[in-house]
Amino acid sequence: MKKYGYWIALLGLIAFNLYVFFPVSPETALERNIRWAGENGKELERVLEHYRRTGEEQKERCARYLIIHMDRRAAITYEGIVQEKEIITPDLHAIRADFLIENIDLAFEVWKKYPWCSHLTEQEFCRMILPYRMKNEPLEDWRSFYYHRYKGVADSLAAAGATMEEVVFFFNTRYGKRYTHEAEKYRGDLSYKLIEEIGGGTCDHLALNAAQVMRSIGIPLNIDMLPYHGKVNGGHAYNSFTDEKGKFHYFSPYERAPERNRWVAPVVKRIRYESPAYQEVTSSYFPVTDVMLEQPYLSIATYNRGWLNEIKPGVTENGKTTFKDLSRGLLYFPVDSLENPIGIPPFILGEDGVPQFIPAPEPERTVQLRDMHLYDVKRVLTLDTARTYTLRGWDNGWQDIATALPADSLTLHFDCVPDYKLFVIYGSTPYVADMQRPFVMQGDSVVYY
C-alpha cells in the first residue's frame, strides 16, 4: 500500500513538472467549437481554409468571430398539432460551409459598397451586419434573398447620397410589412419565407424581419426587446440604429415615419450574436437612475398582466442592493428571487430620479373611489352590470378590500374603502383581471402605473 502511494506521489510530481516546464496550450474557443461540431467540424474548417486560400485575411478573422460565438446559436422549431414539440438544432451541427461563405461575402460586399455603413469598425461590422442569424429562426438565405431583391433600390439611394435614417424610413414606408394577429398562432421565430407569405407578423416577427432586410443592404439595425411595458400591459420589440453622426434612433418595425408612442419600459434588452445573448440598453431609450435599498440579495419587479414579473436582480455589496439603470416615472416592486414581496414597499421612481415609496396602508381611514373605469390601454371597457368587481389594496401583496356592482355599463363606485395607498381593480373574467393597472390617488385624481 505504501509502495502504491509512493508511485501515485511520483506520478503527480512528474505531471506537475511537465505542466510547469512544458505547458500544453489551452484549447481555444475556436478549436473547442470545431471539436464540439463533431462531423460538421469539417464544414467550419472549410470556411477558414477557403479564406486562407484566397488570401482574404479580414474575412478569415470575421469567420473566426462567427465560429467562436456559434456554440450558443441554434434554430428552434415546433412540431405537433398545437406546436407542443420543441426541436433545437445547434448551428455547430447544422451549418454548411457554402452557406457561411455566402453570408460573409455578401456582408462584406455591402460594408465596402454603401456609404451609410462604410464608417463601421470591424468590430461593429461583426456585431451588427455580419451575423447570419439574429435569434432562433431557421438557418436560411435571407441575406441573399433581400440583397438581390433590393440591391437596385439601395444602389439608387446610395447614388442620391441618402443618409442611414433616410434609407431606413424609405424602406419602412415603401416595403414595411403589417402587424397581423394571424401570426400569433405560430410559436418561436419565424422563417423569413413565412413572413413573406403571410405579409407580416407580430412585433417580434416584424422586428426580426426588419433587421434581416436592413442588414442585407448594410444598415446596422438592432432588435431591442421590451419584455414588459411600464404603464400598459404586454411587451414590445423595437428596432434601433445609431446613424453616421452618432445619433440614436428607435422605432416600431411597422412605423412609416420616425415617431412612436413613448411608452416607457422598465428594461430594454438588445439581442446579440455574442454571449451573453442580451445586452441591457435601457439608458439609450429612457432617463434612468440607480436605486439602492438597505437589504441584500433583492430583485426588482414590475406589474404586468396581473402578476409581478422580475425585471432583473440587483447587485449586492456591503449588505445593500443596488439596481442599475431603472427607468424613471414607473412603479417598482422589490421582491426576492422567486418574485415574492419581501416587506419593502413598492416605490414610484420620480422623473427627478428620487424613489417615492408607497406609504403604509391606513385601514382605519377611508377614501371614496368614484367614477372608476376599466381600461384596455386607453380604451374604456364596457362593464358587465351583473358581475361583481373587486378592489384590492397593496399590503406586502394584494389584499381584497371591497367589492361593487357597476353603477352603469362604464362606471364603478367604491365608497368608504380603507386607504391602502396603492390599488388595483380585478374583474371576474381573466381578461379584465389581467389587464388592469395599479393606481394611486393624488388628491382627487387617479394616476395609473
Report each predicted region and the residues it spans.
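Short amphipathic beta-strand segments in non-cytosolic proteins
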Residues: 296-315, 388-403
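Hydrophobic/aromatic-rich core segments of domains that either
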Residues: 26-31, 158-169, 173, 182-193, ...
